[in-house]
């Protein structure tokens, strides 16, 4: 209820937005299409969707600003998996950037070119240090050479930190890779 109250104070007609979104979803599920409209197109067509997305982004930005203020000298970082899809989650990097110290591009990929592209895409959207998070998921990284190639690609694209993720999946051999490649 607090969210609905804040939305009303913000000027968003929550019931209207809900009805529009339900109608759009009902239509999409009744007649699926190969190329659905983007959120940006839906926002252009439906003021209620535009207002809902703007409200969500404002809510996230307000939260991140409060978090940064409370953090004091502690580093504030956010993770970015797909920078092009961030707006759908309510995170507009341009809006929250002033409240962040760093951004981590999540590179859960198996190809060095994909890691480079992810880092480049994030770096183009922010004027902050961009770190790389590389997965050790065995379905993505099958050898030390694969891991080294991903780390090298990340280091080629950013001067930020490179971290290994999915420690719960790490084998003894992968611990050795981390030591040799990142150590």
What residues fall within each predicted segment?
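Substrate-binding cleft of secreted/luminal carbohydrate-active enzymes
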Residues: 100-116, 133-183
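Aromatic/hydrophobic pocket-lining residues that form the small-molecule binding cavity
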Residues: 60, 64, 115, 119, ...
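Glycan-recognition and catalytic regions of carbohydrate-active enzymes
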Residues: 79, 129, 172
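Surface-exposed amphipathic alpha-helices with a cationic face
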Residues: 64-76, 120-130, 155, 179-182
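Active-site clefts of carbohydrate-active enzymes
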Residues: 32-49, 123-147
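Acidic (Asp/Glu)-rich catalytic clusters
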Residues: 93-99, 119-128, 151-158
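Polysaccharide-binding and catalytic clefts of secreted carbohydrate-active enzymes
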Residues: 1-96
């Amino acid at each position: 209820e607090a969210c609905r109250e804040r939305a009303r104070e913000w000027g968003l007609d929550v019931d209207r937005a809900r009805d529009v979104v339900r109608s759009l979803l009902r239509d999409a599920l009744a007649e699926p299409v190969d190329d659905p409209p983007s959120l940006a197109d839906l926002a252009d067509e439906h003021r209620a969707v535009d207002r809902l997305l703007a409200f969500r982004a404002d809510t996230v930005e307000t939260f991140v600003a409060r978090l940064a203020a409370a953090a004091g000298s502690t580093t504030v970082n956010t993770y970015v998996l797909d920078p092009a899809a961030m707006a759908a989650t309510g995170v507009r990097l341009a809006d929250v950037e002033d409240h962040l110290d760093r951004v981590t591009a999540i590179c859960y990929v198996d190809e060095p070119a994909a890691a480079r592209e992810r880092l480049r895409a994030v770096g183009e959207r922010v004027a902050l240090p961009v770190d790389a998070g590389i997965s050790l998921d065995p379905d993505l990284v099958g050898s030390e050479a694969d891991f080294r190639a991903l780390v090298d690609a990340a280091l080629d694209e950013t001067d930020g930190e490179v971290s290994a993720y999915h420690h719960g999946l790490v084998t003894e051999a992968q611990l050795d890779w981390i030591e040799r490649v990142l150590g």
